[in-house]
Amino acid sequence: MFEADYARTELAVTTPGTDMVCQRGWYSSTDFWSPELFDMYVVPQLRKLTALAHKHRRKFAYVMTTGVEMLGPRLADAGVDVLYFVDPVLDKLSCRKAAELFGDRMTIVGGLNSNTLVEYNNQKIRDEVREAMDVLGPTNRFILHPVDSLFPDVPWESVACMIDAWKDYQ
């Protein structure tokens, strides 16, 4: 399996216009791996992938939604530049804790659970955007993003509210 990941990464980093390679680690979380097994089997392969990306002056991103508090520092140590998706609800990882752990080591994508948008409570959406921006914004390594995506049941008004709250923060 690693050979396929390496070949895919190599193709991506040698393709003109590629800025970043993203490895989806949906099955590389503490839901499936103990920290010891993660260190033994995932980290060494990940180091090779990040080294390949960096050799070609590309960024390397990794997707992980649970177990981030425990495994995230290992991702940073392995050379990951961007961590998708820091989820304050699903993973119970507050923006403050994420900033402490990774704020100076990796760009963090997330900070807002998409379920917040389903409820369409303007004040709650604005409060959560402000919290994420207050805490993670100063790191200059933060991309506000509803984790893990916008689903069909999310009212557009909620998305507009999130965007407006972000704009108001600027």
State each model region's role.
Residues 1-170:
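Active-site loop segments of alpha/beta catalytic cores
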